[in-house]
Amino acid sequence: MGKTLKEVAEYLGGRVIGDENAVVGGLGTLDDAGEGQITFLANPKYAQKVATTRATAVILPPGAPGHGRNVIEVSNPYLAFAKLLTLFYVAPPKALGVMDGAVIGQGVAMGKDISIYPGAHVADGVKMGDRVTLYPGVVLYPGVELGSDVTLHANVVVRERCRIGNRVTVHSGTVIGTDGFGYAPDGKDWYKIPQIGIVILEDDVEIGSNAVIDRAALEATIIGRGTKIDNLVQIAHNCVIGENCMIVSQVGISGSTKVGNHVTMGGQVGVAGHIQIGDNVMVGAKSGVPGNIPANQIVSGIPAFAHRDWLKASSVFPRLPEHRKTLASLEKRVQELEEKLKADEKVK
């Protein structure tokens, strides 16, 4: 259903420049949007496309040229784009109840407007808030607790006693609360250390597909409020991840590491165990983090160090073979000069 630009602007907290009664019913890119759609400019390098877009309206930052188009000005066009996708395309879930083929254990407490699909398995003593959706193949072990507005996609597993907060989404194939990797050597074999702790996902966490978060050995592995974790991430036992972190695909964080708030880790970062990473740290892709990082640092490399220094060092790497030849030539020349000086001394 379409909305006027006035309605859209009110929803976004922006202002209309142009025809506030123009109607839009969807979004598109600057290149592909047409009549009846709205587009946005988030990257200044595409500003010239505003003049040629066929969209009915453009979302722009304050002061950006509109080239005669209908404009909605907002402080953050990219955030506005995300909100409009929700407005136009994300339908509120419809409560389906417990469908045939779902398995529900004894003593399960369920809130209102639940949807549990065929093939889901809810064990004894599970507690769920309102508007929880469990897709086929979801398995909740005994004693799991889910808040309200939780969505667990197909084949998610939540192990015993783990706790998930409100408005949490976990995507297909992820395991929450698998055993931590803990073994004690006895001089001959490895003795498994029972992992009796849990995992806690706080409110507004989202976790991608095929990620694994290990349960703590004794207490809790914690993922802080608002943190987003990409596909194929491994977080080991006893870790504490702060609030509003962004952890990209294939990151591995070793056990008992503490990560602060608003930390960003690029793809394939490896983090050692038993270290601390401060607030607002950014770690570049493929970095190896062997030790503590103070707050507000940007690091990259293997081992990770200051990002600017890493850029300088990495610019030298491709020329190392050439520099090695030059160094060998200089060493040879120095040796020749030293031998000549010795010969001259003997002559004197």
Curated annotation (Swiss-Prot):
Keyword GTP-binding appears in the UniProt entry: no
GO CC field: membrane
Keywords, ordered alphabetically: Acyltransferase, Lipid A biosynthesis, Lipid biosynthesis, Lipid metabolism, Repeat, Transferase
Catalytic activity annotation: a UDP-3-O-[(3R)-3-hydroxyacyl]-alpha-D-glucosamine + a (3R)-hydroxyacyl-[ACP] = a UDP-2-N,3-O-bis[(3R)-3-hydroxyacyl]-alpha-D-glucosamine + holo-[ACP] + H(+)
Highest classification ranks of the organism: Bacteria, Pseudomonadati, Thermodesulfobacteriota, Desulfuromonadia, Geobacterales
Presence of keyword Membrane: no
Catalytic site positions: H237 (proton acceptor)
Gene: lpxD
S-S bridge residues: none
Xref: HAMAP family: LpxD (MF_00523)
Example of a GO biological process term: lipid A biosynthetic process
Matches recorded under PANTHER family: UDP-3-O-ACYLGLUCOSAMINE N-ACYLTRANSFERASE, UDP-3-O-ACYLGLUCOSAMINE N-ACYLTRANSFERASE 1, MITOCHONDRIAL-RELATED
Pfam families in the cross-refs: Hexapep (PF00132), Hexapep_2 (PF14602), LpxD (PF04613)
Function statement: Catalyzes the N-acylation of UDP-3-O-acylglucosamine using 3-hydroxyacyl-ACP as the acyl donor. Is involved in the biosynthesis of lipid A, a phosphorylated glycolipid that anchors the lipopolysaccharide to the outer membrane of the cell.
UniProt GO MF annotations: N-acyltransferase activity
EC assignment: 2.3.1.191
Annotated protein name in UniProt: UDP-3-O-acylglucosamine N-acyltransferase
Gene3D superfamilies (UniProt xref): Hexapeptide repeat proteins (2.160.10.10), MurE/MurF, N-terminal domain (3.40.1390.10)
Protein family: Belongs to the transferase hexapeptide repeat family. LpxD subfamily.
Pathway given in the UniProt record: Bacterial outer membrane biogenesis; LPS lipid A biosynthesis
Subunit structure: Homotrimer.
